[in-house]
């Protein structure tokens, strides 16, 4: 990371000189129309060049943002659609490097999330923000929003941010970890179905090498006393059951999760289970974890590959 990279990041988040000098009634009018959810007035304003030139300008109290961010924050779908129709930048950043999609996800506005994704919003959010829409949805248990993000290409595994120092390497904090710790089993399962790595929620060996002592999902789930369903899912999706080191104190406890892990260590995987792992792993490596439905095999086998049997 050099000074030029840092300067570029801060320049992206600073308002233009024109924005600073012209906190005009035009910008206030646009924001007021969005705040009032008055899509008709907003549309009429944006048909005039004196207003449209400020469609991507950041303004407002608190966290200055664009009108599109404001619409996403309040869940004002009709205003959001009007702004997009008039050419608003779908991935515009506020001063915290958050995109309108990130804001919509944070506030739980599923309809706005769908429209933004269909308009081409990056499902991963901004590379300059250490959080992401997927992390937020997994933490909040917003399974429908998480489904939309993953269906539009969001990454289920942890990836290094740009620049490198923007990545949190002090601890494991991928979406699988958050879903487990916050008790969102549906999100946990959904992430695994979309190719999340069941060991570290990360396939980037370079990134893992920078973590002093990476902890596996199995370790985290046992440490936080997660329900046995989490342990079973990790085992079923191919987690390395020998990675967690279990002390004698733990193995002597009457814990269902530990019992499942010990049972898995003592019982070889069935051939059918191993085939499922190989097929799913091959699809993930090809970047098409959801292509199972396209396989020319009996429906019952498709259901098995999707962990529905």
Curated annotation (Swiss-Prot):
Pfam families in the record: Ank_2 (PF12796), SOCS_box (PF07525)
GO biological process, one term: protein ubiquitination
PROSITE patterns xref list: ANK_REP_REGION (PS50297), ANK_REPEAT (PS50088)
Keyword Endoplasmic reticulum: no
TM ranges: none
Domain SOCS box per the UniProt entry, residue ranges: 268-308
GO cellular component, one term: cytosol
Pathway assigned to this chain's UniProt record: Protein modification; protein ubiquitination
Family annotation (SMART domains): ANK, SOCS_box
Keywords: ANK repeat, Repeat, Ubl conjugation pathway
Subunit structure: Interacts with CUL5 and RNF7.
Family: Belongs to the ankyrin SOCS box (ASB) family.
Domain remark text: The SOCS box domain mediates the interaction with the Elongin BC complex, an adapter module in different E3 ubiquitin-protein ligase complexes.
Functional description taken from the UniProt entry: Probable substrate-recognition component of a SCF-like ECS (Elongin-Cullin-SOCS-box protein) E3 ubiquitin-protein ligase complex which mediates the ubiquitination and subsequent proteasomal degradation of target proteins.
The name this protein goes by in its record: Ankyrin repeat and SOCS box protein 12
Lineage, opening ranks: Eukaryota, Metazoa, Chordata, Craniata, Vertebrata
């Amino acid at each position: 990371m050099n000074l030029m990279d840092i300067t570029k990041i801060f320049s992206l988040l600073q308002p233009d000189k024109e924005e600073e000098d012209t906190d005009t009634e035009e910008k206030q009018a646009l924001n007021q129309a969005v705040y009032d959810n008055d899509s008709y007035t907003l549309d009429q304003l944006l048909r005039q060049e004196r207003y449209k030139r400020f469609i991507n300008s950041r303004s407002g109290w608190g966290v200055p943002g664009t009108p599109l961010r404001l619409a996403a924050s309040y869940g004002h779908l009709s205003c959001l659609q009007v702004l997009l129709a008039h050419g608003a930048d779908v991935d515009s950043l506020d001063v915290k490097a958050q995109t309108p999609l990130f804001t919509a996800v944070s506030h739980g506005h599923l309809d706005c999330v769908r429209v933004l994704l269909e308009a081409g919003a990056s499902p991963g959010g901004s590379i300059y923000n250490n959080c992401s829409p997927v992390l937020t949805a997994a933490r909040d248990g917003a399974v429908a929003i998480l489904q939309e993000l993953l269906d539009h290409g969001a990454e289920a595994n942890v990836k290094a941010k740009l620049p490198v120092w923007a990545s949190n390497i002090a601890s494991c904090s991928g979406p699988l970890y958050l879903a487990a710790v916050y008790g969102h089993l549906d999100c946990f399962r959904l992430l695994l179905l979309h190719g999340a790595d069941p060991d570290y929620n990360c396939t980037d060996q370079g990134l893992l090498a920078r973590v002093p002592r990476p902890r596996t999902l199995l370790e985290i789930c046992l440490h936080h006393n997660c329900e046995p369903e989490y342990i079973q899912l990790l085992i079923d999706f191919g987690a390395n059951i020998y990675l967690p080191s279990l002390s004698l104190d733990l193995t002597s406890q009457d814990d269902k999760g530990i019992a499942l892990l010990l049972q898995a260590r003592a019982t070889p995987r069935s051939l059918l289970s191993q085939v499922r792992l190989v097929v799913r792993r091959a699809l993930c490596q090809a970047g098409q974890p959801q292509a199972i439905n396209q396989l020319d095999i009996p429906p019952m086998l498709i259901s098995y590959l999707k962990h529905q049997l």
